[in-house]
Amino acid sequence: MDYIAEPATDMSHTSDWPLPADSLRLPIPAALLEKLAVHPLSRDLYPTSLGHYRRARDHRMSRERHDEHLLIYCSEGQGLLRVREGEAWREYRVGSGDLLWLPPGMAHDYAADDRQPWTIFWTHLRGDSATWLQHSAGYRDTPLRHWGLQHALLGGFEQLLEVRHSGYRFQHFLLAASRLRSLLCQLPLLRPLREGSLDLDGLHAYMREHLHARLELERLAAFCNLSKFHFVSRYKAITGRTPIQHFLHLKIEYACQLLDSSDQSVARVGQAVGYDDSYYFSRLFSKVMGLSPSAYRQRVRQGEGGA
């Protein structure tokens, strides 16, 4: 990997990596930051920008000066981090389940792997309690810890990102500051997952995030850092079904919600859960539910399927 590919920036500006449609970068306006910096519920810890980059090919950043805390949680793929320690640079390989915590003053650069680019959640943050939380979470002497793919972290970052729907209303950003505090306060209570262990909550959260997609077994196994054989074997031993069966059931469950609550056509519902072929979707739906999507919708609307 060619590492530093762009000039170092001053302070804690976010990267200008070209943002694809399925990724998010949300800088918080200065007027809101001024309010967060003085409000009694947020002044000691609040986000200044946040985002989610999916399979971020060619993503890289270099900062010589850094005046905020930065968290990066890798949920898929790989990357490389370098931090300056005195006159030397130390290098860290970053993988799925790693959480980076880069404090103010730590010169650093990082980049997604060329062949397996990372998927990351990230947030810049400020506040007097941030350093205390950093140390209590075990980051006093290292910028990287492996926690594994834990529901508490995946769900925590996803909750933070809900602020993008707020229309920049202050109360929503105050809630985001509270959620950030909750996320960081959980870290000392989490047990890092051992390499090769299986976190079902984290895996199922990943599945729910990709209900619109076709996730192959190889990708699910890679998400858990396991071979396909060991992944299926462990999953089936715990749940009694295969991971693909569970993913299919999650898709059908979501399709039922859409059929219940919207007037979308069966074809559109199928597309929403990753099936462009409406006939194939209908066959899968019928196999799981025992009736076609149209019959299911008619039954529910006639009052036969509700509480």
UniProtKB/Swiss-Prot annotation:
Give one GO term, molecular function aspect.
sequence-specific DNA binding
InterPro entries for this protein: AraC-bd (IPR003313), Homeodomain-like_sf (IPR009057), HTH-like (IPR037923), HTH_AraC (IPR018060), HTH_AraC-typ_CS (IPR018062), Tscrpt_reg_AraC-type_HTH (IPR020449)
Membrane spanning segments where? none
Identify the domain of life: Bacteria
Concerning SUPFAM superfamilies, the annotation shows:
Homeodomain-like, Regulatory protein AraC
Q: Does the keyword Cell inner membrane apply?
A: no
User: Where does the record place the HTH araC/xylS-type domain?
Assistant: 201-299
Q: Which PROSITE patterns match?
A: HTH_ARAC_FAMILY_1 (PS00041), HTH_ARAC_FAMILY_2 (PS01124)
Give me the positions annotated for DNA binding.
Answer: 218-239, 266-289
Q: Which GO terms describe its biological process?
A: positive regulation of amino acid biosynthetic process
**UniProt keyword terms in alphabetical order:** Activator, DNA-binding, Transcription, Transcription regulation
Functional summary from the UniProt entry: Regulatory protein for the mmsAB operon. Activates the transcription of the mmsAB genes.
Q: What is this protein called?
A: MmsAB operon regulatory protein
Which species is the source of this protein? Pseudomonas aeruginosa (strain ATCC 15692 / DSM 22644 / CIP 104116 / JCM 14847 / LMG 12228 / 1C / PRS 101 / PAO1)
Q: Which gene encodes it?
A: mmsR
